[in-house]
């Protein structure tokens, strides 16, 4: 069984508990009192040609184990805000990434930046749950959904005020994302079947993005050279988690990154 299959199997078990909390009913009851979502997609849409940073608050991963032992999500998020991130991503998956919805709630309340809920969405109830916990955007993974699900979930997210980053890994998934109406697409350089990483995946797929789509590169970015390559390839933003914890090159850059990489 692949990594992704294992994760999705667990997520489908979790959905039963989520539905027991009646997130749709709670959303309908509370929506008039919810703060407007901060524009995640708009934060990445610059006309200046600079590459923007989505900084990920990440404690662990299935491939690396614990990355940050002294994990304080709010402290990390505030640091990312200080270094010039345009948006944040927070892992909420418990079993495989040691994340938590509580981390997202705390980060969303502490920062001004828009926040993406990074998790594996397999049911509509998780979308309402995301809005209630303070997310401004969600991730939808093409490999985890049927095309009709993707289309329906994009519509539901829009109706609740959430932006959507649609994640792809190959040309077929990119075409599916475009056909179902995605306006912000992220290329995951990590293959979710075996967790191998190939940074060239993003640049290989970039020419096939629909016009006016926000293009994001995710995973495996470690050096200033990686960043320069993606900027030159025409990406609007990069999503970086582990690299910001391990690479002084990346934290030393002035974000958003200009043509001079200074």
Curated annotation (Swiss-Prot):
GO MF terms, alphabetically ordered: indole-3-glycerol-phosphate synthase activity; phosphoribosylanthranilate isomerase activity
A matching Pfam family: IGPS
GO biological process, one term: L-tryptophan biosynthetic process
Pathway noted in the entry: Amino-acid biosynthesis; L-tryptophan biosynthesis; L-tryptophan from chorismate: step 4/5
Known EC number: 4.1.1.48
PROSITE patterns (UniProt xref): IGPS
Source superkingdom: Bacteria
UniProtKB keywords: Amino-acid biosynthesis, Aromatic amino acid biosynthesis, Decarboxylase, Lyase, Tryptophan biosynthesis
UniProt xrefs under NCBIfam families: PRK00278.2-4
UniProt-listed PANTHER family: INDOLE-3-GLYCEROL-PHOSPHATE SYNTHASE (PTHR22854:SF2), TRYPTOPHAN BIOSYNTHESIS PROTEIN (PTHR22854)
Protein family per UniProt: Belongs to the TrpC family.
Protein known as: Indole-3-glycerol phosphate synthase
Source species: Chlorobium luteolum (strain DSM 273 / BCRC 81028 / 2530) (Pelodictyon luteolum)
Phylogenetic classification of the source organism: Bacteria, Pseudomonadati, Chlorobiota, Chlorobiia, Chlorobiales
Gene that encodes the chain: trpC
């Amino acid at each position: 069984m692949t990594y992704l299959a294992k994760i999705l199997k667990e997520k489908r078990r979790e959905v039963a508990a989520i539905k027991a909390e009646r997130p749709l009913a709670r959303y309908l009851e509370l929506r008039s009192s919810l703060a407007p979502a901060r524009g995640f997609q708009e934060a990445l849409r610059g006309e200046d040609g600079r590459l923007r940073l989505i900084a990920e608050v990440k404690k662990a991963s299935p491939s690396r184990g614990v990355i940050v032992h002294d994990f304080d999500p709010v402290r990390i998020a505030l640091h990312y805000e200080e270094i010039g991130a345009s948006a944040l991503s927070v892992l909420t998956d418990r079993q495989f990434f040691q994340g938590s919805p509580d981390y997202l709630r705390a980060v969303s309340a502490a920062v001004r930046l828009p926040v993406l809920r990074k998790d594996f969405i397999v049911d509509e109830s998780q979308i309402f749950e995301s809005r209630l916990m303070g997310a401004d955007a969600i991730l939808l993974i093409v490999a985890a959904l049927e095309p009709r699900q993707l289309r329906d979930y994009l519509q539901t997210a829009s109706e609740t005020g959430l932006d959507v980053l649609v994640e792809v890994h190959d040309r077929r998934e990119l075409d599916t994302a475009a056909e179902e109406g995605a306006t912000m697409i992220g290329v995951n350089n990590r293959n979710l079947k075996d967790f191998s990483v190939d940074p060239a995946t993003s640049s290989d797929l970039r020419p096939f993005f629909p016009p006016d789509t926000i293009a994001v590169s995710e995973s495996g970015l470690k050096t200033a050279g990686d960043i320069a390559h993606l900027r030159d390839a025409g990406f609007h933003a990069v999503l970086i988690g582990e690299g910001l914890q391990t690479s002084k090159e990346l934290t030393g850059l002035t974000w958003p990154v200009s043509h001079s990489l200074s």
